[in-house]
Amino acid sequence: MRLLILTGFILTLLYACRSTKVIQKAIEKKDTVAVVVPVDVPTHDDTVKLIAAIFDGYKAIEYKTFAAKIKVDYFNSKGKQPDFVANVRMRKDSIIWVSISNDLGIEGFRVLIDKDSIRVMDKLANTYQVKPLTSMQDIVQIPFSLSSIQELLVGNPVFFNRDSVIAYTKTEKGYTLLSSGELFKNLLSFNNGFAFEKSKLDDKDLMRNRTADLSYFEYESKTGVMFSTYREMFLSHQNKLDIQLKFKDYKFNEALSYPFNVPKKFKRIQ
């Protein structure tokens, strides 16, 4: 299927959203020497103060527009799959534009996502599709939004509610917060400088055995924004998927265009 590469990229992001949205509330630490303190024990006041300090120290990325070139490598149960480059442009709460090409720079697909729909041009087959965003929601089985995908791409924690924190840990390496949603647990880890390092998502239904590990590395601040330029996603449900994202040429708050002109010769398909 010609849309396999495109679907793999977008569904990778959406699956992570899924495990984050339903999970939206957890952040935990693997360090075995850490002391976990439930929020509702006698140290509640100290817990509240620590959680507040973490959120005061952590600065979510604020932006109006964002653009980046992303090198995508991924592995599934059959081994390494063909890598590709995704050029992404976004206007917050409005639009996501993606151009997918191979290492030689030959564009294969172009995608436009807004609050209601997803449009896909297959430049290899001279076809295009227009589908409601809800069709993607059905595939990943969560009511995600445009803004959820944007937050995931820019590197902010998604679907996390500080009011749902049930435990925390403090170690020499940093902090973790654990929250629990209806279907998932979400574990967020921060270093001592309050940089967001990891989100670990676990399905509360052990029969589904659904997990996701999202890790953030190689922070830099070339644009005045602390930004993770290398990320790893390990997804496990019925199959396992390992995705590596390398961000290059990223920029914030610059004027962007979102060209999506369908040639007359392209055939619309369902």
Where in this protein do the model-derived segments appear?
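Post-signal peptide N-terminal segment of secreted/secretory-pathway proteins
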Residues: 68-110, 116-117
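C-terminal motif of bacterial Sec signal peptides marking the signal peptidase cleavage site
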Residues: 13-16
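An acidic-aromatic
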Residues: 95-146
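N-terminal leader/targeting segments and the immediate start of mature chains
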Residues: 18-71, 75-81, 267-270
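Gly/Pro-enriched, hydrophobic low-complexity segments
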Residues: 19-26, 166-270
